[in-house]
């Protein structure tokens, strides 16, 4: 009901509303380790969840970058483990604050303290804090699910209690941090003692134990881990992790709790009392495997539901189109074990609540739609944005830093021959669009877009939308390129159909560096695609010729996770490079009929 004007009383006709959610679990996960959120900030997240009928708050309370929950038996976890010197994530945030003229990336001063001359960042929740937040959530119909991640992602604890790790093997492995040592009985006792205190603070029957991204190399070297493998008649370090997870589940059940784990634990032999959080979009078998084992599954594949990922024009559309039960391999009985959906917010590059708001609104509202409505009842994108208008008005009143819907009417690179017109639209009424053409950041004093702009030369635009309250959204940059049709080339004598694809064993973060990595295979592909044989560390270089049927301006979409580049006629046309989540850019070029050399690079 949208209230307008200053009238104080309203009449609502007598009606009967019949409505119910499609899924029982409608969740949101907040990472409090990489960056810390105080009590009021957590309550604010709970308020937003409550507005849109999300009812499960998954609280990530420990990780390598900080331990956030008081454990009375082990005081160093918060005395020392809750605080750190600025790390690469903090430095990246501070750099972005300056580069993008965006205070959302500044590190809050109330989470910084000076100890013996060192600047430390952090914070933690006392038992009383936890009880207060749990009560606040309960009043809003929200269950709180704590996560203490183990056996990996445990460096904040291991740094204070090094005896928890394999002897002499503390730090970082090839990808992830050193895990705990499951060969030590004392380590297992430590884990149980931590969870005993956690169980007492959180009344909900489920507790999350993590279980993801475990660096097992230390276990291969550790005599105690190898002894455990022999004693328990295990065959590998993978089975050692499975043994540890099963052992913890027994402890959970003995204490009246049920275990939830990330989808890496789906093959660990857990009981049907356990639940699985499916996060790896590429682990396609996790969902059918878990449901076949009669384990409840919380669906949150990163491609759709990692709200820390950068947003583009497709983000909301993808969420609305997603059906958690669409996997054709699932029987009707298996679909009954799909417990619901959840969005996850990892906070490496999110230091402020304003940045959280920007990343989750309106995506949280789209999540609520698919959690509540049957597929046939969901709105299409146009209708969804129409329904959002009053929601944005509510956000304005609440002073929520929501993301303004994408400006429409242009691509990342736009081609024209003689002259063209820039015509913009914004789906949200009441906004202002300011722009610059000199590379600077648009401000409230920059030129106001109030109608079509005539362009007769190559021009770089920076557009920024300002909400009705005057607060800015992110800057969008686009290039208009004036150029004649690019000439075609003469066909080589030995030209064959398809593209040549060279696969490199690449572990870097820039497409230009792929060539230096070892070659693992060469293929011919019919289109720009990843050959079926290519897995693991991927660096692909695809080369060939594009056959253009007629003179014209052609449009290319480049979608990748991580980086990609498109080079046409020797010119870098599409730059989607760097390590990032799924992002699409669209570019144009004026081409003459005939053959044009093309190169596409991609790494993951």
Describe the residue ranges of each PLM region.
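Active-site beta-loop-alpha junctions enriched in small/polar residues
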Residues: 33, 62-66, 149-153, 212-214, ...
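Active-site neighborhood of glycoside hydrolase catalytic domains
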Residues: 157-163, 167-273, 280-292
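Flexible, acidic glycine-rich loops studded with aromatic residues
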Residues: 259-274, 280-421
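Short beta-strand-plus-loop segments that form exposed binding edges in beta-rich domains
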Residues: 599-604
């Amino acid at each position: 009901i949208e209230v307008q004007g200053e009238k104080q009383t309203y009449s609502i006709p007598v009606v009967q509303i019949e409505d119910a959610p499609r899924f029982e679990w409608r969740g949101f996960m907040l990472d409090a380790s990489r960056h810390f959120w105080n009590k009021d900030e957590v309550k604010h997240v709970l308020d937003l969840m409550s507005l849109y009928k999300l009812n499960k708050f998954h609280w990530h309370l420990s990780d390598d970058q900080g331990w956030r929950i008081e454990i009375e038996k082990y005081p160093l976890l918060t005395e020392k483990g809750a605080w750190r010197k600025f790390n690469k994530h903090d430095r990246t945030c501070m750099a972005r604050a300056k580069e993008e003229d965006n205070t959302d990336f500044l590190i809050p001063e109330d989470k910084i303290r000076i100890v013996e001359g060192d600047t430390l960042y952090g914070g933690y929740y006392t038992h009383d804090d936890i009880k207060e937040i749990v009560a606040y959530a309960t009043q809003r119909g929200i269950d709180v699910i704590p996560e203490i991640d183990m056996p990996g992602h445990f460096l904040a604890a291991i740094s204070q209690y090094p005896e928890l790790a394999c002897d002499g093997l503390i730090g970082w492995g090839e990808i992830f941090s050193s895990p705990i040592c499951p060969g030590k009985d004392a380590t297992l006792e430590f884990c149980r003692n931590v969870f005993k205190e956690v169980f007492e603070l959180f009344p909900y029957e489920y507790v999350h134990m993590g279980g993801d991204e475990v660096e097992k190399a230390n276990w291969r070297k550790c005599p105690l881990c190898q002894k455990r493998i022999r004693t328990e008649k295990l065959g590998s370090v993978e089975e050692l992790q499975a043994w540890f997870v099963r052992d913890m589940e027994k402890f959970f059940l003995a204490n009246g709790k049920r275990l939830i784990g990330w989808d890496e634990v789906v093959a660990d032999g857990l009981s049907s009392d356990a639940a699985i959080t499916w996060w790896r979009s590429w682990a396609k078998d996790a969902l059918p495997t878990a449901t076949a084992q009669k384990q409840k599954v919380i669906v949150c594949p990163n491609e759709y539901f990692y709200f820390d990922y950068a947003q583009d024009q497709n983000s909301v559309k993808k969420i609305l189109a997603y059906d958690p039960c669409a996997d054709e391999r699932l029987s009707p009985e298996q679909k009954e074990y799909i417990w619901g959906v959840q969005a996850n917010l990892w906070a490496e590059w999110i230091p402020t609540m304003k940045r959280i708001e920007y990343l989750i609104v309106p995506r949280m509202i789209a999540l609520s739609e698919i959690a509540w409505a049957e597929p046939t009842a969901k709105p299409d994108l146009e209708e969804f944005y129409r329904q959002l208008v009053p929601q944005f008005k509510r956000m304005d009143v609440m002073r929520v830093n929501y993301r303004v819907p994408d400006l429409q009417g242009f691509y990342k690179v736009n081609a024209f021959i003689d002259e063209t017109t820039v015509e913009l639209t914004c789906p949200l009424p009441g906004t202002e669009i300011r722009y610059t053409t000199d590379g600077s950041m648009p401000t409230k004093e920059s030129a106001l877009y109030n109608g079509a702009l005539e362009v007769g030369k190559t021009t770089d635009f920076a557009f920024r939308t300002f909400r009705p309250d005057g607060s800015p959204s992110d800057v969008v940059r686009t290039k208009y390129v004036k150029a004649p049709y690019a000439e075609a080339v003469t066909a080589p004598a030995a030209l064959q159909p398809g593209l040549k694809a060279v696969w490199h064993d690449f572990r870097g973060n820039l497409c230009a560096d792929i060539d230096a990595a070892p070659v693992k295979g060469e293929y011919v592909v019919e289109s720009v695609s990843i050959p079926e044989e290519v897995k693991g560390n991927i660096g692909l270089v695809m080369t060939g010729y594009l056959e253009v049927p007629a003179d014209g301006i052609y449009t290319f979409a480049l979608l990748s996770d991580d980086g990609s580049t498109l080079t046409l006629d020797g010119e870098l046309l599409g730059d989607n490079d760097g390590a990032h989540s799924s992002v699409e850019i669209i570019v144009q070029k004026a081409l003459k009929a005939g053959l044009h050399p093309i190169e596409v690079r991609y790494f993951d």
